[in-house]
Amino acid sequence: MSSSASRSQKERAFFQTEPWDTIDPNLVGIDSLKSRLQILLAEIIRREFPKIKAQIDKSLADAKHMLEALGSDRDSTEQQRKFLEEVAMKFQKIRDDAMETQYHKHHVLKTNKSLRLPTLVADRCDLLVKEIVRNGHAVQFDHDIDIDGELNDTGEDDYKDHNVTERTVVRNPGQDELDELMITPPILPVPEEKEVKKWIEEEYRASRGYDLEVMDPSILALLWQTQSQNWDFITRNFINDIIAYVHRFFCTLLTEVCPDTRTRDALLSRMMDDMLASYRRAIEHVNFILKVERFGTLITKNHYFADTLGKIRSKRRESDMKGLAFRGRQWHYSYAKETDTELLVRVSDLTKGRRYSSNLDQAVEDLHDLLLVYYKVARKRFVDAVIAQAVDYFLLTGEESPLNILTPPFISSMSAEQLEQIAGENMASKNKRHDLKKQIAALEEGKKVLKA
């Protein structure tokens, strides 16, 4: 007889003697205790089962997420190439949606506004226009003949949040690689409040020859180069800011699609020369546009030039004629009353008007009008060219844009050594992958046990 059976027999014999024989047999003995403990354990398991299952599910999801963050296995060259191609495709997908302002499609675009590149660029382009309008000219033009009323607009309300004379490049820590490109120009001088015609006369006297004192195109070119000198500062700061936005977008998005720091840093290092080259091309193109507009031939086929020049001269002649005008009855209107009057000018007075004290005065006035109108035409053309060419083509959408560097073909061009250097796993990463796989297998086995 086993010890367990012998013990049970002795317990029954004991509880059949007085006074223990009065106790319910189901409440005494080891066998009764064992049965009740089993019932209690079953109740506890039923009560705690949902919590245990939820904890296992959470631990399993966390482990799978960490394994997914490590990417696919990267032991072989093909596995490494596949891993980096997946990174490139994820990058392209989010980049394309960001450039189309489809911010709702990705959580990172909804939460990280530094990735809303088109919006940042649009805001900075608006600021460029305001800066050029407010501070682009070195000397204020004549207020009296500014047809559009925009060249001498102080625009204080537009500049509450921007110190235009001391703008600095908007960069984040970690963008030191851009330092050699982003040479901050000297402080921008604000437009001088001196009399523009006096300035033109001074320049004219310092540059004229001894022939007839008429409007000289060579003097106009000198005036133009001085009047547009502030464009350099404004435009260089502008392109620096756009490059900073693009670089921050690239690095932030790369961090999102490639969380592994070692792989990301190696991949970024591999692309950095190409990225810096694309930034240089944009800066060089801005310099080219500045050179053409400021030092090239003064030329335009825009009819706005002739139209506006005619308006300015008509406005000045109208001002001259007001001194010769008188009030007369409106006979030419059939409905006019005898008391209705208007300003009239005699035909014989049309030959009268502005009298210049010298040929120099007329030459200065002609130079001012031509400089004013050409400045407005060239300024609009210049801003459009910088945005369309240097920003849109060279930095955002062109074939050699920095945003088009990380592509599957770029990954395919890498050698086996480069792939190993960039995507090959170190021992710590391999051990972490092994531990996660082991943990996932154990948790999945636990789920099977719970289901059973």
Question: What is the predicted role of each segment?
Answer:
Residues M1-Q38:
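Conserved phosphate-handling catalytic cores of large alpha/beta enzymes
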Residues V28, P50-A452:
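Extended, charged coiled-coil "stalk/tether" helices of large eukaryotic trafficking and scaffold proteins
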